[in-house]
Protein backbone atom coordinates (compact mmCIF):
# COMPACT_ATOMS: atom_id res chain seq x y z
CA UNK A 1 0.00 0.00 0.00
CA UNK A 2 1.33 3.41 -0.97
CA UNK A 3 0.47 6.90 0.22
CA UNK A 4 -2.49 8.55 -1.50
CA UNK A 5 -3.50 12.18 -1.97
CA UNK A 6 -7.16 13.20 -1.66
CA UNK A 7 -8.26 16.84 -2.02
CA UNK A 8 -4.66 18.00 -1.53
CA UNK A 9 -4.10 16.01 1.69
CA UNK A 10 -1.70 13.08 1.93
CA UNK A 11 -2.77 9.87 3.64
CA UNK A 12 -0.61 6.89 4.54
CA UNK A 13 -1.69 3.25 4.83
CA UNK A 14 -3.10 2.41 8.26
CA UNK A 15 -5.23 -0.78 8.34
CA UNK A 16 -5.08 -3.33 5.53
CA UNK A 17 -8.21 -5.06 4.22
CA UNK A 18 -7.12 -8.44 5.63
CA UNK A 19 -6.97 -7.06 9.17
CA UNK A 20 -10.34 -5.36 8.64
CA UNK A 21 -11.84 -8.70 7.56
CA UNK A 22 -10.40 -10.46 10.63
CA UNK A 23 -11.91 -7.92 13.03
CA UNK A 24 -15.28 -7.99 11.28
CA UNK A 25 -15.38 -11.77 11.69
CA UNK A 26 -14.53 -11.40 15.40
CA UNK A 27 -17.24 -8.77 15.95
CA UNK A 28 -19.80 -10.88 14.02
CA UNK A 29 -18.96 -13.90 16.18
CA UNK A 30 -19.46 -11.83 19.37
CA UNK A 31 -22.81 -10.51 18.16
CA UNK A 32 -23.94 -13.99 17.07
CA UNK A 33 -23.06 -15.35 20.51
CA UNK A 34 -24.75 -12.51 22.41
CA UNK A 35 -27.92 -12.47 20.30
CA UNK A 36 -28.44 -16.19 19.67
CA UNK A 37 -31.89 -16.18 21.30
CA UNK A 38 -33.19 -12.98 19.70
CA UNK A 39 -34.09 -11.46 16.37
CA UNK A 40 -32.10 -8.20 16.32
CA UNK A 41 -32.71 -5.32 13.97
CA UNK A 42 -29.41 -3.98 12.65
CA UNK A 43 -29.53 -0.25 12.03
CA UNK A 44 -26.83 0.88 9.58
CA UNK A 45 -25.83 4.53 9.83
CA UNK A 46 -25.22 5.80 6.30
CA UNK A 47 -23.16 6.76 4.49
CA UNK A 48 -19.97 5.70 6.22
CA UNK A 49 -21.03 2.36 7.71
CA UNK A 50 -22.36 0.81 4.50
CA UNK A 51 -19.24 -1.28 3.77
CA UNK A 52 -18.84 -2.40 7.37
CA UNK A 53 -22.55 -3.22 7.63
CA UNK A 54 -22.55 -5.28 4.42
CA UNK A 55 -19.53 -7.31 5.49
CA UNK A 56 -20.68 -7.66 9.11
CA UNK A 57 -24.21 -8.83 8.34
CA UNK A 58 -22.85 -11.53 6.00
CA UNK A 59 -20.85 -13.00 8.90
CA UNK A 60 -23.51 -12.74 11.62
CA UNK A 61 -24.91 -16.22 12.22
CA UNK A 62 -28.50 -15.17 12.99
CA UNK A 63 -30.91 -16.33 10.26
CA UNK A 64 -33.75 -14.03 11.39
CA UNK A 65 -31.64 -10.87 11.65
CA UNK A 66 -32.96 -7.82 9.78
CA UNK A 67 -31.22 -4.66 8.61
CA UNK A 68 -32.45 -1.13 7.91
CA UNK A 69 -30.78 2.22 7.27
CA UNK A 70 -30.70 5.77 8.62
CA UNK A 71 -28.48 8.70 7.78
CA UNK A 72 -26.90 11.37 9.96
CA UNK A 73 -24.16 13.88 9.20
CA UNK A 74 -21.73 15.48 11.65
CA UNK A 75 -18.51 16.05 9.67
CA UNK A 76 -17.37 18.84 7.37
CA UNK A 77 -14.00 18.06 5.81
CA UNK A 78 -11.72 16.51 8.42
CA UNK A 79 -13.52 17.95 11.47
CA UNK A 80 -16.57 16.96 13.47
CA UNK A 81 -18.93 19.96 13.56
CA UNK A 82 -20.44 18.92 16.89
CA UNK A 83 -23.86 19.26 15.26
CA UNK A 84 -25.66 16.12 14.15
CA UNK A 85 -28.09 16.49 11.25
CA UNK A 86 -30.67 13.78 10.57
CA UNK A 87 -30.82 13.26 6.82
CA UNK A 88 -32.85 10.03 6.60
CA UNK A 89 -34.86 8.87 9.61
CA UNK A 90 -36.15 5.63 11.04
CA UNK A 91 -39.22 4.13 9.36
CA UNK A 92 -39.55 0.80 11.20
CA UNK A 93 -41.47 0.01 14.38
CA UNK A 94 -38.73 -0.87 16.87
CA UNK A 95 -40.89 -1.20 19.97
CA UNK A 96 -39.73 -4.23 21.94
CA UNK A 97 -36.95 -4.99 19.43
CA UNK A 98 -33.29 -5.56 20.17
CA UNK A 99 -31.42 -2.92 18.15
CA UNK A 100 -27.79 -3.05 17.09
CA UNK A 101 -26.57 0.21 15.59
CA UNK A 102 -23.83 -0.28 13.00
CA UNK A 103 -21.45 2.70 12.81
CA UNK A 104 -18.26 3.19 10.85
CA UNK A 105 -16.56 5.20 13.58
CA UNK A 106 -17.30 6.55 17.05
CA UNK A 107 -15.30 9.70 17.66
CA UNK A 108 -16.70 12.32 20.08
CA UNK A 109 -19.82 10.26 20.82
CA UNK A 110 -22.18 13.07 19.78
CA UNK A 111 -23.92 11.12 17.01
CA UNK A 112 -24.11 7.97 19.15
CA UNK A 113 -25.72 9.79 22.08
CA UNK A 114 -28.30 11.54 19.89
CA UNK A 115 -29.08 8.35 17.99
CA UNK A 116 -29.52 6.31 21.17
CA UNK A 117 -31.84 9.00 22.57
CA UNK A 118 -33.89 8.99 19.36
CA UNK A 119 -34.22 5.21 19.46
CA UNK A 120 -35.12 5.10 23.18
CA UNK A 121 -38.20 7.24 22.39
CA UNK A 122 -39.54 4.22 20.46
CA UNK A 123 -39.20 1.77 23.40
CA UNK A 124 -36.83 -0.86 22.02
CA UNK A 125 -35.96 -3.84 24.22
CA UNK A 126 -32.30 -2.81 24.06
CA UNK A 127 -29.90 -0.68 22.04
CA UNK A 128 -26.30 -1.74 21.44
CA UNK A 129 -23.70 -0.42 19.06
CA UNK A 130 -21.16 -2.09 16.79
CA UNK A 131 -18.47 0.12 15.28
CA UNK A 132 -15.54 -0.71 13.11
CA UNK A 133 -13.43 2.09 14.62
CA UNK A 134 -13.46 3.74 18.04
CA UNK A 135 -11.39 6.72 19.20
CA UNK A 136 -11.48 6.38 23.01
CA UNK A 137 -9.32 9.51 23.49
CA UNK A 138 -11.86 11.63 21.60
CA UNK A 139 -14.99 10.41 23.41
CA UNK A 140 -16.66 13.44 25.05
CA UNK A 141 -20.10 12.01 25.76
CA UNK A 142 -21.81 8.68 26.02
CA UNK A 143 -20.14 5.35 26.55
CA UNK A 144 -17.92 3.04 24.55
CA UNK A 145 -19.72 0.89 21.96
CA UNK A 146 -20.48 -2.69 22.95
CA UNK A 147 -18.75 -4.10 19.86
CA UNK A 148 -15.53 -2.53 18.53
CA UNK A 149 -13.37 -3.63 15.62
CA UNK A 150 -10.38 -1.38 16.32
CA UNK A 151 -9.46 1.17 18.98
CA UNK A 152 -7.54 3.91 17.17
CA UNK A 153 -5.87 7.22 18.13
CA UNK A 154 -7.56 10.54 17.50
CA UNK A 155 -6.44 11.07 13.90
CA UNK A 156 -8.41 11.59 10.69
CA UNK A 157 -8.84 8.44 8.62
CA UNK A 158 -10.56 7.46 5.39
CA UNK A 159 -11.26 4.48 3.18
CA UNK A 160 -13.50 1.44 3.66
CA UNK A 161 -16.62 3.61 3.79
CA UNK A 162 -15.06 6.62 5.52
CA UNK A 163 -14.65 9.70 3.36
CA UNK A 164 -13.21 13.15 2.95
CA UNK A 165 -15.97 15.33 1.50
CA UNK A 166 -17.47 12.29 -0.24
CA UNK A 167 -14.22 10.96 -1.71
CA UNK A 168 -12.36 7.71 -0.96
CA UNK A 169 -15.24 5.67 0.51
CA UNK A 170 -14.53 2.97 -2.07
CA UNK A 171 -10.98 2.23 -0.90
CA UNK A 172 -10.72 -1.33 0.47
CA UNK A 173 -8.07 -0.34 3.04
CA UNK A 174 -8.03 2.39 5.70
CA UNK A 175 -5.63 5.33 5.48
CA UNK A 176 -4.63 7.93 8.08
CA UNK A 177 -3.87 11.60 7.45
CA UNK A 178 -0.11 11.96 7.39
CA UNK A 179 1.17 14.06 10.28
CA UNK A 180 2.75 17.34 9.16
CA UNK A 181 1.13 16.89 5.76
Regions found by a protein language model. Give the residues of each.
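PRPP-associated nucleotide enzymes
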Residues: 1-181
